[in-house]
Amino acid sequence: MNTTSKPSAQRNHHVEVWRVNAFTDVPFKGNPAGVVADGDGLSEEAMLAIAGELNDISETVFICQPDDPGAELRLRYFTTTMEVDLCGHATVSALFTLGWLGRLRGDNETRTVRVQTNVGVLELGLQFAAGEPAWASMQQLPPQTAPAPGAEHAPAILGLPESALSTRFDTGCAYAGLWACFVPLEDVSWLRRIRVDSDRIEELWPDNPELSGIYPFAFVDETTTQGRFFSPPKYGIVEDPVTGTACGALGGYLLSRGGMPGDGELVARQGFEMGRGGLARVSRNANGNMQIRGQAVPIFRGELLA
């Protein structure tokens, strides 16, 4: 007798999952995110399990109905190990997915949508060109800055000599939804030489458990930076290709030091040392909030049967 069980024709859950590369218009570049377009009815445990199943993706976003009356949607973000409050590339990926599914529509205009996140209700936008999603914009929070109490540890954490650090700006922390520590380098060539000690990242600000990572960067020209982003081990991410929340905070860091471009928009390049280069456009809107813009491309969509 054959006792091998066969898959049931009826399953309790059919979860459609997209893989989307954000902050790029080139397939297999930028930052990949998992997108679950219908997250309603999934428990937090199930969301974490799905994010864990997509273990080569740093974050998975779940699009849900809001419980805040001032929002039209809710976005929840999970790494393979925990829920996080905000994620830039997953937000861009979610907006594009809503456009591809026809849940956001437009011809040659920008559709705005108010979205509930764990840091509050944010205004997002999806710009259409000839009916197709073209650019996503994400309002972040008013920028905050703070000293990095452990700034002297930055070179050792990155595996670089002190001579690699720029004399133009100091090492410091900034926030536009998540805290990050920014380490300015003399030139882009130092980015390729980094050998990060992830276990020591929290030494940069030991009293802040919300420090999301370290962001070494250098100027390519007066309007463009190139950087890398590394997280402490608790996030389950060693290096992130293009980090939208950190790019927004970078804008706040540079604003506080007079380093933003004269026209107010910074091009933040990231992920090139990983072979996944992409970029975010960073500015400050009329309300004083940081804003990032980016593109995205779909890689695949499938059904998770569990």
In which residue ranges do the predicted regions lie?
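Active-site proximal loop and beta-alpha junction motif in alpha/beta enzyme cores
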Residues: 2-86, 92-306
